[in-house]
Amino acid sequence: MNQSLFHHSKQQEYCPQCGAPLQIKQGKKGLFLGCSAYPECDYLRPLQRSEHKVLKTLDEICPKCGNLLQLKQGSFGMFIGCSHYPECDFVVREESESEEKITCPECKTGHLISRRGRQGKIFYGCDNFPKCKFSLPAKPYSVPCPTCHFPLSLLKSEDGEKQIFQCANKTCRHIFEQ
């Protein structure tokens, strides 16, 4: 059997820190290039994946680095980001002015904002992350719990004028009507 079938034809890359060959490795966040001399050399670089398809280059300037912004199609839908990604990771965030800003009950200085997790699921977390790790699985409401007086609740169901809430305090989880 022809041995060339078992070798890739792409040119070998070498570690910029120690000169050893780079290897494709699997991590919890996907594939990356890592130094074959690990653990003596800890160089690694994420593999460039074409997961963001550029739909249009815009006339807007990136406020972080000064390059042009682009409309891109990602795995969670369309978004506007910097044309110099991954060097610049600026992404335009949608901010709805109509929503009230809810203060984080844990750190008292941050506000809870909508975020998207690794699997694309939306959750609400403190904008002081990573200093404050408070998060909720659904949209919080400023409805205090009648049992423990925690300031936030999650809307469980809505039926006409009747609303069922659940306390957002992980140690309480009391369900009540409003």
UniProtKB/Swiss-Prot annotation:
Q: Cross-referenced Pfam families, in alphabetical order? A: Zn_ribbon_Top1 (PF01396)
- Name listed for the protein in its UniProt record: Uncharacterized protein HI_0656.1
Can you tell which superkingdom this protein's organism belongs to?
A: Bacteria
Q: Name one GO biological process term.
A: DNA topological change
The family annotation for this protein states: To E.coli YrdD.
What is a single molecular function from GO for this protein?
A: DNA binding
Extract one GO cellular component term from the record: chromosome
